[in-house]
Amino acid sequence: MKTRPMKSDWIATARTLSEAVPFLRRYDDAIVVIKFGGHAMGDAEAMASFARDIVLMRQVGVNPVIVHGGGPMINAMLAKLDINSDFVNGKRVTDAATIEVVEMVLSGLVNKRIVQAINREGGRAIGLSGKDANLIVCDPADPALGFVGEPVEVTPDTLLQLVRSEIIPVIAPIGTGREGETFNINGDTAAGAIAAALKADRLLLLTDVSGVKDAQGKVVTELTVENIEEMTAAGVIAGGMIPKTETCVTAIRGGVRAAVILDGRAPNACLLELFTEHGAGSIIRRG
């Protein structure tokens, strides 16, 4: 016996596809840099859903470039190895022992899990870090924090070659120093720097929040750089949202057309943001 979905389901699907058509044209051959992080990384189904979305984006002509984090996995491995961390103003000091673990976890464990998830869904992904082909060269972000880097040079040639070959780059936020040191880079910061170097059409920061909120706690769906600066000065944007919006503003000033902060835990968040009228988070434009 064979059954069919209700007619209302067919109509809803048709409407969704119809709505997506102009956006599919809009993003054909566009480069979209996506920072994958938050709790979605630790959930197998969320990881698989993300991978399917990325593969679909590639199949319809979008060029996704993935940058990932991995803080919880790093914490777990440091605890397992009984390596204690010092903190300065709430930020981890990354000493010589810690940076080895950070690189091992980000490049060797987290990166390959994401690559494998994408390839399992039919995509072609390749994993690399900011060290490969001198992709990201760093200076120390703060000497007191040890091997934590701030990108000063991004060479995107290798990424462009991969994108032209319809391969999905997956990048671990590890950079190299001017003297050959290894640096850990904040994932959002790395994604923003790479997006600017690629002159990406979009930078998507997947987080554990639904977007930038106003003074009443409601998500603001569209903002300008000036709005961000005003809300930050007024204390409306505060705490952990400040570095995320700063990353977006810096990327936009560096040549990215727009940046979006959205909830990576929501199903199909990237697809909803790119291919629907409503979007899925807070989009920031130059103004």
UniProtKB/Swiss-Prot annotation:
Annotated coiled-coil segments of the chain: none
PANTHER family in the cross-refs: N-ACETYLGLUTAMATE SYNTHASE, N-ACETYLGLUTAMATE SYNTHASE, MITOCHONDRIAL
Enzymatic reactions: N-acetyl-L-glutamate + ATP = N-acetyl-L-glutamyl 5-phosphate + ADP
Keyword Calcium carried by entry: no
Sites where the protein binds substrate: 70-71, 92, 184
CDD domains in the cross-refs: AAK_NAGK-C
UniProt keyword annotations, A-Z: Amino-acid biosynthesis, Arginine biosynthesis, ATP-binding, Cytoplasm, Kinase, Nucleotide-binding, Transferase
Pfam families (alphabetical): AA_kinase (PF00696)
Job description of the protein: Catalyzes the ATP-dependent phosphorylation of N-acetyl-L-glutamate.
GO CC list: cytoplasm
GO molecular function, one term: acetylglutamate kinase activity
Identification of the protein by name: Acetylglutamate kinase
UniProt pathway: Amino-acid biosynthesis; L-arginine biosynthesis; N(2)-acetyl-L-ornithine from L-glutamate: step 2/4
Keyword Cytoplasm belongs to the record: yes
Family: Belongs to the acetylglutamate kinase family. ArgB subfamily.
A GO biological process held by the record: L-arginine biosynthetic process
The species this protein was found in: Dinoroseobacter shibae (strain DSM 16493 / NCIMB 14021 / DFL 12)
